[in-house]
């Protein structure tokens, strides 16, 4: 009986630890090593519009929208898609937008070896430089997942993990409607917010449609939209 009790307690502890690590891996407020940012601590009405993945089929359209609205944004691109769409990536850089590293293969970087993480980041850094982009390269983990080795690598290289605090597409009842996406952003925006959208693929048509609406809505609220690097300059 005592042996069975010990086994049961051990199983419960293991499951508890696994659950805790899972929650930590997706947390936007905690990581084991280094710095992370999900918003800038400021009272100024500034916010960053960020796009994950790509370059993809909608790159030209989103760039046309941003140019028309005179907005600079941050694009977290994957290495594989930069290789496939180098001309689009070069246009992103050429039009003065910020490019961040979103890994090479868009694999969850949890329970991966240090060598895998190093290769994913450094290969993509090299590809980003090939676009002509000369600014600081921030890193955003795929799916926002990080645990031990990724934060440790970034901290050793004095790089922060860039996350977000406004993500309308995470709500199934919102993601398929451009107006609802816009409303969610307008209702949840605050000084220093980092907004996450996915607009690069055909399946994200409603997200793409929401971009102009979001920009217009935030301008009406008195917000200035900028890149993540510029946003961080407003930190208290």
Question: Language-model segments: which ranges?
Answer:
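N-terminal Lys/Arg-rich, disordered targeting/topogenic segments
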Residues: 1-4
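Hydrophobic membrane-insertion alpha-helices, especially the h-region
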Residues: 6-23
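Active-site beta->alpha N-cap acidic-glycine motif
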Residues: 28-112, 116, 120-127, 135-136, ...
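C-terminal domain-boundary segment and adjacent tail
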Residues: 34-41, 68-69, 82-83, 205-236
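Alpha-helical scaffolding segments of alpha/beta enzyme cores, especially the outer helices
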Residues: 61-64, 87, 91-94, 119, ...
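Short beta-strands and strand-loop turn motifs
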Residues: 101-103, 163-167, 194-199
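Domain-start "cap" segments at the beginnings of catalytic or binding domains
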Residues: 125-164
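His/Asp/Glu-enriched short active-site or ligand-binding loop at hydrolase and phosphoryl-transfer sites
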Residues: 151-187, 223-234
């Amino acid at each position: 009986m005592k042996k069975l009790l010990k086994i049961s307690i051990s199983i419960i502890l293991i499951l508890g630890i696994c659950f805790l690590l899972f929650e930590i891996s997706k947390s936007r407020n905690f990581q084991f090593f280094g710095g992370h940012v999900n918003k800038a601590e400021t009272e100024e009405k500034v916010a960053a519009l960020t796009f994950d993945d790509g370059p993809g089929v909608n790159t030209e359209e989103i760039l046309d929208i941003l140019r028309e609205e005179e907005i600079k944004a941050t694009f977290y691109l994957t290495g594989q898609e930069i290789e496939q769409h180098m001309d689009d990536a070069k246009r992103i850089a050429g039009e003065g937008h910020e490019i961040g590293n979103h890994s090479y293969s868009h694999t969850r970087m949890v329970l991966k070896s240090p060598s895998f993480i190093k290769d994913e980041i450094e290969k993509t850094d090299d590809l980003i430089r090939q676009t002509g982009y000369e600014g600081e390269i921030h890193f955003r983990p795929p799916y926002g997942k990080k645990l031990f080795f990724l934060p440790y690598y970034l901290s050793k290289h004095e790089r922060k993990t860039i996350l977000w605090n406004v993500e309308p597409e995470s709500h199934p009842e919102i993601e398929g409607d451009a107006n609802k996406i816009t409303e969610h952003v307008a209702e949840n925006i605050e000084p220093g917010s980092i907004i996450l959208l996915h607009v690069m693929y055909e399946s994200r048509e409603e997200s793409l449609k929401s971009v102009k609406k979001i920009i217009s809505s935030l301008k009406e609220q008195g917000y200035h939209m900028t890149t993540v690097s510029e946003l961080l300059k407003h930190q208290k």
